[in-house]
Amino acid sequence: MKHLIHYFFRKSLIIAIVFMLTMMQLTAQTDSIANLPQYLFPNFDTSIVRLKTGELFKAVMNYNTLTERMAFYQKGTLLDLVKTETIDTICIQNRLFVPFERSFYEVILNAPVAFFIQHKSDLISTGRPAALGTTSQTVGITSVSKLVGTRNSYNFKLSENFKIKPYEVYWVRMNNEMHKFLNENQLLKIFTAKKHEIKIFINQFNLKVNKTEDLVKLASFCNELFR
């Protein structure tokens, strides 16, 4: 009996140690892809994916602003989500994303006048060493499409010769048409019939279209105007 108890104790201990080592390895692997500048979120996080069939599943995901692809972490490997036509929505850290062609836009307000943010970034060469310790930046912005192959190396840590410059593009969907804007003036041109009222609202509350919380207020106001 004592031998049996000792056997089960040793077996339980081995299982516990293997489990702990597995968790430590997983943590180390996810830590290695934390705080990478090309990603929208600091960490890969458990996300909810809804398919167009209504099926739900979970995946550890983040959004790569450089390639404009959803990246997911599976069995120690980073992969791109390529079958975007099957996706309805993805929820990451309580923020909702919908597919547009092969990329994803963040939903600011899903309404008759819908607002979205397209999160992007440029890959900037930091240059090569020049005379007297200076740096040459003549290379400038690099086309990612020329650099990314079937296995996307830009899901991982980038070379020190490059840096990421993030920016946003804003979209309005109205009457099933998408309209792009980058600033307040471009937004007002989309709503020519109501631009006076929108301008007053922006000035009254000192809103900035490049601040998400302000854009939510502005989106709600625009929907009230077009009821």
Model-derived segments and spans:
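Flexible, solvent-exposed short loops/turns enriched in glycine
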Residues: Y167-K199
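Bacterial Sec-dependent N-terminal signal peptides
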Residues: M1-S32, L218
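Glycine-centered tight beta-turn/hairpin loop motif at sheet-sheet or coil-to-beta transitions
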Residues: K52-G54
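Short N-terminal segments immediately surrounding and downstream of signal-peptide cleavage
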Residues: T30-T46
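Long, compositionally biased interface segments
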Residues: L188-R227
